[in-house]
Amino acid sequence: MSKVSIVIPNYNGEKCLRECLASLKKQDYRDFDVIVVDNCSEDASLQVIEESEGELLLEVIPLDNNYGFAKAVNDGIKASGSEYVILLNNDAVAGRHMVGALVNRLEKEPDVFSAQAMMLQYNNRKLIDSAGDYFCVLGWGFARGRDEAASRYTGKCDIFSACAGAAIYRRKVFDEIGYFDENFFAYLEDVDIGYRAKIYGWRNVYEPEAKALHIGSAASGSRHNAFKVSLSARNSMLLMYKNFAPWQKVVNFVPVCAGILVKIAYFARKGLAGAYLKGIFSSFFKMK
């Protein structure tokens, strides 16, 4: 059994998946297997995966529909028997030392649930794509350091949560806190599980010695589109509803309302206010 399982959720990732898998073949740390969970892709993704089967210890889990990110990674995590699980986006390219650096961090710090790699922008490798996820009082989840110089983010630190695009998780903790919430489908499910881990007393950290390039928006399109805006709005509300203590819901009510108004104004300028409001209102039907 491998020390680490690398779970790659995939949906129509033919154009980027080949480079993702090629980067895993070059890792200096070798005690890992790869599990690709395919969300019923309509392109040649499965053919691309087959090309790597002889060079990687590789398993494919084909799903019969596009169930989204959360279910895909959950199925991959449950199929693994490893001590650690790395989640890697299909449009991410792992640096040669990524796997080893992430494993080393969790080995040294037993109170850590997740550790995120330094995610660099694929088309401008001097800029950060994500150096961890934060969640602010306005009810916004956002990527730490995005579009800033990578040279400013070379220090190890604790973060609110790890971006699941390139991060390692201590597998046993999922049995304690639960898996990724499949109601989220996609977006902010990594912030949600990081929040849950913190509630249970676990830490989430940033590991800059592990690096990955990230193309971004490979499955959904541009950074802002109706699909992403609506789902992100809905999931931000669900995240707070699930994880806030009663006193937090009271204290943060006004700041969260202010945050919603700011977002409405912002997305109105992009023609996406309707999508944002649709997401906010749809969240109420998911609250139990």
Where are these regions (language model features)?
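Short aromatic/hydrophobic "clamp" motif used to bind/position activated sugar donors
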Residues: 85
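A recurrent flexible, glycine/aromatic-enriched loop bordering the glycosyltransferase active site
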Residues: 127-128, 148-169, 192-193, 221
